[in-house]
Design a protein with these regions (language model features):
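Glycine- and acidic
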Residues: 43-46, 179-184, 230-234
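Active-site-proximal binding-pocket segments
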Residues: 172-179, 189-198, 206-214
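Catalytic cores of secreted or luminal carbohydrate-active enzymes
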Residues: 235-280
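Alpha-helical scaffold segments in carbohydrate-active enzymes
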Residues: 1-5, 57, 64-67, 80-98, ...
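Beta-rich accessory regions
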Residues: 68-95, 99, 186-197, 262, ...
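Well-ordered alpha-helical scaffold segments within catalytic/enzyme domains
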Residues: 54-75, 124-135, 179-194, 248-257
Length: 321
């Protein structure tokens, strides 16, 4: 496959990129600014770059492919992919964890040196599930501390890092889609209180935006009383990534899971933020069936009401530690 071949040109087990010509992009992850990938002292990373979140995407892809193979009756392929994902997770922890920042490195450079910088990329690692549970919780705790969390959302780079600039495109700004993926990661590790905190921050930010529509990004200044978030002058609005953010935050808060094989929609440890008392979801589809739901908040708990179903479909709440 591409992942295990051209995607890993030096065979170290990590997917990486390297600019092929001088006119190409120096950085080829979602943070593709020229200065987005750097070391703790501010030096730009050079050579083949293995981004932290990309390894998580590979891990998640192999686990999902293993599930597909098992459903298709290809058990040997399923076991192979599952084993590869497990080995990748072990290799990942050894190579990317940086005790000096109590988080995962932003990337490995061409010499396999970790970029020991606190960034939101580590938050996206939680979304993919590759992080060990104890380390995931430590990363999550950092994401909601003042170095990252402004009251409006989570910055792309912590405020005490060398290249931090709250007005930078990728080095200190707040990207709604980035926050949404982090929220899914928080939910994955059972941190629903943190999900609610992040949900409220972005909802509050949206109330200051034109048409209450979250833009591509906005500046990473700290929230102040009687002042809204500082807009990024050339941010796209509307923007596809950002437009999905409210739905993704709701997915994270409710713990929505879709099990097509069982014809079941599950709400895992659902929790609504304090500003949201009730949500009605219409035409929630699973295959050819659909359901309308009402979720009501009662303190830190929720009540679920099935308003209407079409076709064969089950809905359940799963409460787990």
């Amino acid at each position: 496959s591409w992942i295990d071949g051209p995607g890993d040109p030096d065979g170290d087990g990590f997917v990486e990129y390297l600019r092929a010509n001088e006119q190409g992009l120096a950085n080829q992850g979602w943070k593709d600014s020229q200065d987005a990938i750097f070391h703790a002292d501010g030096r730009l990373a050079e050579g083949g770059i293995a981004l932290v979140e990309v390894q998580g995407y590979v891990y998640a892809a192999k686990r999902m492919a293993a599930r597909c193979a098992r459903r298709l009756g290809r058990e040997s392929l399923a076991q192979k992919l599952h084993s590869e994902a497990t080995r990748l997770a072990e290799h990942f922890e050894a190579a990317f964890w940086c005790p000096e920042i109590d988080s995962y490195a932003l990337a490995l450079d061409g010499a396999k040196r970790p970029c020991a910088v606190r960034t939101s990329n580590a938050g996206q690692v939680l979304f993919t599930g590759i992080a060990a549970p104890d380390r995931a919780r430590r990363v999550a705790q950092q994401m909601l501390q003042p170095r990252f969390f402004t009251g409006w959302g989570i910055r792309t780079v912590a405020k005490d890092e060398a290249r931090f600039n709250p007005m930078s495109y990728h080095n200190g700004s707040i990207w709604p889609h980035d926050n949404a993926l982090i929220a899914l990661g928080l939910a994955r590790y059972g941190l629903k209180h943190s999900v609610a905190q992040l949900f409220k921050a972005l909802f509050d930010a949206a109330t200051y935006m034109d048409l209450r529509r979250l833009p591509e990004l906005f500046c990473g200044f700290r929230r102040e009383k009687q002042r809204g978030p500082t807009l990024y002058p050339v941010a796209c609005a509307p923007q596809a990534w950002a437009s999905a953010t409210p739905f993704t935050l709701l997915e994270a808060a409710l713990g929505l899971e879709f099990d097509a094989a069982r014809g079941e929609i599950r709400l895992r440890n659902p929790r609504l933020p304090a500003f949201l008392n009730e949500v009605v979801l219409r035409e929630l589809r699973l295959g050819s069936s659909s359901v309308d739901l009402r979720v009501s908040r009662h303190g830190d708990e929720v009540a679920l009401e099935v308003l209407r179903t079409r076709g064969r479909i089950q809905v359940s709440i799963v409460l787990a530690n």
